[in-house]
Amino acid sequence: YHLAKLGYTDVVLLERKKLTSGTTWHAAGLVGQMRSSLNLTQMVKYSGNLYETLEAETGMATGYRRTGSVSLATNQERLTEYKRNASLAKVHGVDVQILTTDELRDKVGFFNLDDVVGGAWIPKDGKADPANVAMALAKGAKNKGVKIFEDVKVTGILKENGKVTGVQTEFGEIKSEVVVNCGGMWAREVGKMAGVSVPLHACEHFYFLTSAVPGLGDMPVVRVPDESAYYKEDAGKILVGLFEPNAKPWAQNGIPDDFCFDQIQDDLDHCMPYLELAMNRVPVMESLGIETLFNGPESFTPDDNFQIGESPELGNFYVAAGFNSIGIQAAGGAGKYLAEWIIAK
């Protein structure tokens, strides 16, 4: 999309199965703005601004809404981190307000805040429908001349004299001066084809969905990192997602060839400690039923940083992967800056 926007329209996108399959289709779609560095803050801020305008450009709804977000701190160390990040975010024009516990009650009154020492409120944070965002970007790219082919699996990377020269597919070769590995949780395998190390691995990622909550409205996204959880409204229900410290690796012997819009076997025993914390944090959950326990794969990197840029092993072979479950939040900015990176060279 961004290459075409910059005038480079001789671009082909190859998708092994269907667009949004793998992880995008089940992503939570949180679009925050407060990150731990200037570059990342700028990147995710751009994503939100892009998603806000995509529908007008493409005619496809992205489901993007600026609901605001609240991040709760249950200790002073966490609150200090929020204050530091808030100061950084303000440099890039991101409105971040540090609130007292009493002020937080006005934002998330149905949360138990007894042990909360403060928090961060970001009015322009939001959420989107990940699949719709992906399809809107695809339509925008096609409108500008990009060709997109589904059900085409890449089987090899062509190279010569230390530079990439194209890709091998099930249906033949495509010559190309530049190749970008956006393979998601398959990016490590695609990298191997090129002799490029892409250190990431899929983990099981869980979320719960409650029954409908009367009068819930469009609540802010709520993050409680000290309990490894986030909360958002989802069609009148509460979705509780987990980022547990001891995650479960998935597909250590390889991702199944036919994996597409698939779900992984759930593990209630693994999730129960976090579900109990969630019920304490949101007391109304005790009277609600849990309609869904979802388990799907997300890829993570060893240092929790993105894998983005030109590979050191092979010239003109770029990587954009390993977004550690915030791919929707990062995608707009990552696409923009990687496209500019490619063109600048």
State where each predicted segment sits.
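Short beta-strand to alpha-helix junction loop
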Residues: L38, Q42-K45, S71-E81, A120-N143, ...
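Central helical "cap/lid" subdomain
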Residues: T169-D218
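Conserved FAD/dinucleotide-binding core of flavoprotein oxidoreductases
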Residues: E233-M279
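Helix-loop-beta segment of a Rossmann-like dinucleotide-binding subdomain
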Residues: M60-S71, R105-K144, T165-G166, G254-D262, ...
